[in-house]
Structure formats: C-alpha cells, structure tokens
Amino acid sequence: PLVPPEVITNVVAAVRNGHAAVVPVVPLVDTIRTVTGDASLGATVPRDSLRAVQTPQGFTRDVLQRAHAEVDAPVTDDAGMVERLGIAVHAVDGHEDAFKVTRPLDVVLAEALIEHRRTR
C-alpha cells in the first residue's frame, strides 16, 4: 500500500520496453562507511553512484522462471538471482515512500505515512 502508482508504472514500462529485469531505486542519503574488524571506521564510500533497491521488481516471465529454477545461491532478492544468470538488471526511479517494512520502526513509519495520506 505504500508504493506510489508511478513506481509500478515505471517498472512495467521498462519491462514492456525490452528490459528483462527491472528494479526501482532511490539515492542513498546516509553516509556509508566501511568498518574494520576492530570496529574502527574505514573509508567513506562515495554515494553518488549508490542506490537502494526497492520493490516491486519486474521481470519477463521466462527470466524469472529460469532464475528460480537455476540459481541456488544466497541472494537477497529476485534481481540478485537474475544477476547470477548474467542478465543485466535495469534501474528506474523509485520513491522514498516505497520503503521496506521489516523492523518494528518501519511499521511505525508505515502507519504514520498511511495516516498522513488518509488525512490530507
């Protein structure tokens, strides 16, 4: 319910335009740093080319079926499986409202966003 319609439109349009695998992405806003084994901060990772991958992800049916049939490796999402096949994954604009809901804080944020949308 949090994904704005334009994100779905972007994903579907990219698949229809010939991309076999598509993910919505948003720029990272946090500073990203490496951390060494002794918990010391290492280098700051330049974030200008980094993006957070969101859902919904889009695929042609044959590519997604092949990925699920052939990939038996640890991955975090379907796009990771498709990449293991050597297939490029295309990025489209996502939206900050389409965040992943996995932690208790995410539930609070999602509820607040839903309430905000309901009352505007």
Model-found features: residue ranges?
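Conserved core of the sugar-phosphate nucleotidyltransferase
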Residues: 2-90
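A short acidic, often aromatic-flanked loop/helix-cap motif at beta-alpha or helix-coil junctions
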Residues: 30-32, 97-100
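Conserved active-site beta-strand element of glycosyltransferases/polysaccharide synthases
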Residues: 89-93, 99-102
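Helix N-cap/beta->alpha junction signal
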Residues: 25, 102-103
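Residues at or immediately preceding the N-termini of alpha-helices
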Residues: 61, 104-107
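SAM-dependent methyltransferases
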Residues: 77-79, 96, 106-120
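A short, conserved beta-strand element in the Rossmann-like catalytic core
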Residues: 1-2, 98
